[in-house]
Each structure stands twice: as structure tokens, then as C-alpha cells.
């Protein structure tokens, strides 16, 4: 037998042994759970667009209990729906769980020059979070309120045209146009509305569709293939919608830098405070690349952290990218679910309209007025409970071997929350957990957070940074719609909604009628 055949045989046996070792990880640990297939584990379930894997978690929870183990390609994941366990991981033991599950296409969170808030970890995450936080303060939200209001008015014009036809419309399409337009204007330097003519929308939609997930599936099973695909997409971004969008952002940043240089040469002083996210991040731009040095630092709450308030050029691209995707998809979905639930619960919709009429009597709606819409806030929170968004990112990576409530977790193991089961747990929500009941929030939400039972925006130090912006957008748009229209179901409305997706769970469509409240 030739030497080459011996080497090939040894490599094959080693390769096979490695994957069987990973696949059998939870069997050796004595932890229950679905096994799937060697090499793959259950990763194929998470890429079934028509039958979302995130909903499959609930089926497995019923079979294996509130804590069980799965493998996803080369990743080992503990799935949990025990509220106390979730709170322990996300809050109390954050020092041991400050990372997130990653995919080779995303790159190494410590070395990827375009790492963003969702991907970054350790000191780098701390720095990015510190720099981005002022963008989402109440002071900043008040400043962009007028821009959001202008976008709302533009969408209302399109909804008026749709309502006049007397037919049901897919509100998900309208809400996606709305949220992308807002992000474009407050984050990307877009100076006018591009609603229903935005060239970026097809690219963004593709990221969340079935076809956009295949590279991640391959990379999850064969990491080296993911690394090679990442290098290919970086060199040829047109082959990937995500990398194509980042390429567009790079051009927008360079254009803004050129404008700044031209203004400086002409003696034009900056207009004062940053006008959008690009300005904010460019003001914090660093002239040096310190990422490699930063990745060697330790990370713990007990350390005295001095945060260097600078961003690299590539990090700015990363932040804009994640703000675009997160701000576009989740808010559009939340609006869709809220509208559907109001249409199917007319008594709740009527109560909400009464609050809107009382608190917002004028055509123009102010920041202070929407802050007084307490029942609307209850409606949105309850919609987010019944249809949790982006729950695939409700995970943490164990960065240091530890013990959580008697369960030993090895370094490198992921902890994934079964958010859908958690949000319907009768022990947290009561026997009416399956009912749409906004009134459950009228006493506040602190108790539900404290129990570890509510994760619409995540939990702990890594909770979604943009949740206040999302709430402002949603409350403002719903106020304008409900002042003028009533959401009604039609023969085209799918009841219950048909849910699809992978990274996020989306309705296939939300076909509703907009019935005018007052005749002209």
C-alpha cells in the first residue's frame, strides 16, 4: 500500500473520529437530547425555513425537559428554558458567559476587524457598547423624533392609497419599507425617503430568506469551508448580500470622509452635534488599529476597565451593518405581530384607540405624548411575549468552565435559550399564558425580568441596545395608524399566522384591512 493511501486513510479516520467525538459529547456527559446525525447533529433543523428550528426547540423541551443538549455541526449547545438558569447565565454569571455563539463566516470575534456589538466580546464589546450607548439615550431619541415622524407621514401616504382600494394588504411589506427607511436616514446618511424604491431592500431581505442561510449551514459543519467562504465574499462581495451591504457602507463612509476633508479645506466648520450615526462614529474614529492588542486583555466585572473611546474605520462599518439589520427586521416584525393581535382582539384595539385619542389629540405627535401611552406599551410588550424576536441570538458561550445550578458547563459550550417555551411558561405567566392579555403588564415588568422569564430584547449587560429606539418607532407609527384606521381581518388573513424563518421567526404575511374610523 502506498504512503499516500496510508496518509489519506489516517486523515479520514482522524476526521471521522473528530466528528463522532463531538456528536457523542452529550451522550458521554449523560445529558438527554435529540442526537441528529454525525457531522450535522441537529443543525439542519435550524435551517428549515418553512418549519423554523426555533419552534422545534419547544417540541424537544416537552420531550427532554427544561435542560438538554444538542450538537450543531461542530458546536455543542445546552438548551434551557428554566427561568432561574437563564437569569444565572445572562446576569449573575455574566463574567463566565460574556461571549456569543459564532459562525466561521462571521470571523473570529477577537480578530475580525469589522466585529460589531452582537459578535464582539470582552474588552472590545465593552468599548463598542460604551461608544454606542449615547446614540440611544432619550436625549438622542428626541433629536431624531422629527426624522422618524417624517418617515411615518410618508408611510401613511402609502397606507392611505392602499386603504382606499378597500382590499387587505400585506402590512409586513409596508413595515419593512418603513423600518429600512428610518435606519437609512438616521444611520446611513440617507437624505430623503426611499420608500418603495430602496435599492438596498432586496439585499437585506435576502439575508433573512432561505437562500441566505446555506453558507452558514456549510460553515457550521465544516469551519474551514466557512473561513474560505468568508475570504471569498470579502474579495467578491457581490456573491453575498451581507458582504455586499458592508461594501455599500464602506463607500458611504469614504464619501462622508471626503466631504469632511473638503469642508475642512474650504474652512467650513462642523455644524455642531453629530447629524446621524455615521457622524457619531466618525467623531470617535481612531487613527490606529489596536484590535489585536485589545484581544489579549482579560475580562471580568471585578477589573477596573478604562474604555478607550475610539473606533476603527472597519468597526464603524460593522456597527452600521448590525444596526441596519437589527433595526430593519425586528421592528418590522414587532409591528406586524402587534397589528395582527389588535385585529384579532377588537376589544383591546378599541381600548388602545381610546388611549391614543385621549393622549394624542393633535395631528402632530410629540415625544412626551407617546411616553404617556402606557397601555400601548403594554400591548407591544405582550405582543413581544407571544412572538419573541431574534431568539436565535438569545445564547451565550461559556468562556470559563463553571457550574450553573448543579450543571457543569465546559469552556466553549453554548447555552441557547428556548425563548418561545419560556414566554409561555405557566409558572411565570399563569394559567392564561397562551392568551393575549396586555393588562398583565400594567403593574410593571420588573418581576418578569427578575424571574428570567422575559427576553424580547435579551437580558443582562448584553441586552439589545436599540430597544428604546424600536419602541419609539413602533409607538409613533401605531399612534398615527390607530388615530385614522382600525385593523380588521379579512378572508385573506391567516389565522393563526403561518410562521417561517431561521434567525428570526416571521409571519409568511400579515394580510389585514385598514378600515377608516371616520368618514370624510
From Swiss-Prot:
Domain of life: Eukaryota
Root EC class: oxidoreductase
Signal peptide range in chain numbering: none
Residues involved in heme binding: 464
Record keyword Heme present: yes
Job description of the protein: Cytochromes P450 are a group of heme-thiolate monooxygenases. They oxidize a variety of structurally unrelated compounds, including steroids, fatty acids, and xenobiotics.
Record family assignment: Belongs to the cytochrome P450 family.
Name under which the protein is recorded: Putative cytochrome P450 CYP13A4
Provenance organism: Caenorhabditis elegans
Gene: cyp-13A4
Amino acid at each position: 500500500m502506498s504512503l499516500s493511501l496510508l496518509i489519506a486513510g489516517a486523515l479520514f479516520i482522524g476526521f471521522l473520529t473528530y466528528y463522532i467525538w463531538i456528536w457523542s459529547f452529550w451522550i458521554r456527559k449523560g445529558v438527554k437530547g435529540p442526537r441528529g446525525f454525525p457531522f450535522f447533529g441537529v443543525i439542519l433543523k435550524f435551517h428549515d425555513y418553512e418549519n423554523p428550528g426555533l419552534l422545534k426547540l419547544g417540541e424537544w423541551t416537552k420531550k427532554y425537559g427544561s435542560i438538554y443538549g444538542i450538537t450543531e455541526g461542530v458546536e455543542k449547545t445546552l438548551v434551557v428554558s428554566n427561568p432561574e438558569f437563564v437569569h444565572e447565565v445572562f446576569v449573575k454569571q455574566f463574567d463566565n458567559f460574556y461571549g456569543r455563539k459564532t459562525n466561521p463566516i462571521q470571523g473570529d470575534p477577537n480578530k475580525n476587524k469589522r466585529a460589531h456589538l452582537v459578535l464582539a466580546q470582552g474588552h472590545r464589546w465593552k468599548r463598542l457598547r460604551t461608544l454606542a450607548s449615547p446614540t440611544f439615550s432619550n436625549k438622542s431619541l428626541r433629536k431624531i423624533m422629527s426624522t422618524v415622524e417624517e418617515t411615518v407621514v410618508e408611510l401613511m401616504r402609502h397606507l392611505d392609497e392602499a386603504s382606499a382600494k378597500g382590499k387587505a394588504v400585506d402590512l409586513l411589506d409596508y413595515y419593512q419599507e418603513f423600518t429600512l427607511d428610518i435606519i437609512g436616514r438616521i444611520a446611513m446618511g440617507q437624505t430623503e425617503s426611499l420608500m418603495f424604491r430602496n435599492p438596498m431592500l432586496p439585499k437585506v431581505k435576502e439575508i433573512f430568506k432561505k437562500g441566505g442561510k446555506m453558507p452558514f449551514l456549510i460553515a457550521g459543519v465544516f469551519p474551514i469551508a466557512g473561513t474560505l467562504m468568508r475570504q471569498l465574499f470579502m474579495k467578491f462581495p457581490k456573491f453575498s448580500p451581507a458582504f455586499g451591504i458592508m461594501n455599500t457602507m464602506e463607500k458611504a463612509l469614504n464619501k462622508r470622509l471626503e466631504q469632511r476633508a473638503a469642508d475642512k479645506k474650504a474652512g467650513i466648520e462642523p455644524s455642531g452635534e453629530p447629524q446621524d450615526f455615521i457622524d457619531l462614529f466618525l467623531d470617535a474614529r481612531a487613527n490606529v488599529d489596536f484590535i489585536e492588542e485589545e484581544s489579549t486583555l482579560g475580562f471580568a466585572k471585578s477589573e477596573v476597565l478604562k474604555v478607550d473611546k475610539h473606533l476603527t474605520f472597519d468597526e464603524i462599518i460593522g456597527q452600521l451593518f448590525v444596526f441596519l439589520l437589527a433595526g430593519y427586521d425586528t421592528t418590522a416584525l414587532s409591528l406586524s405581530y402587534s397589528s395582527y393581535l389588535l385585529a384579532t382582539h377588537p376589544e383591546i384595539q378599541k381600548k388602545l384607540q381610546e388611549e391614543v385619542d385621549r393622549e394624542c389629540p393633535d395631528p402632530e405627535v410629540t415625544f412626551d405624548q407617546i411616553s404617556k401611552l402606557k397601555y400601548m406599551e403594554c400591548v407591544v410588550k405582550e405582543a413581544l411575549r407571544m412572538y419573541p424576536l431574534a431568539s436565535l441570538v438569545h445564547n451565550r458561550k461559556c468562556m470559563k468552565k463553571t457550574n450553573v445550578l448543579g450543571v457543569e458547563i465546559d469552556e466553549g459550550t453554548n447555552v441557547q435559550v428556548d425563548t418561545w417555551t419560556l414566554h409561555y411558561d405557566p409558572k411565570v405567566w399563569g394559567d392564561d399564558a397562551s392568551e393575549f392579555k396586555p393588562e398583565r403588564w400594567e403593574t410593571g415588568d420588573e418581576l418578569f425580568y427578575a424571574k428570567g422569564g422575559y427576553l424580547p430584547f435579551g437580558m443582562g449587560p448584553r441586552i439589545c441596545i436599540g430597544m428604546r429606539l424600536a419602541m419609539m418607532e413602533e409607538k409613533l407609527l401605531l399612534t398615527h395608524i390607530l388615530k385614522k384606521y382600525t385593523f380588521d381581518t379579512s378572508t385573506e388573513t391567516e389565522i393563526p399566522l403561518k410562521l417561517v424563518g431561521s434567525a428570526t421567526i416571521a409571519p409568511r404575511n400579515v394580510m389585514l384591512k385598514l378600515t377608516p374610523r371616520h368618514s370624510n
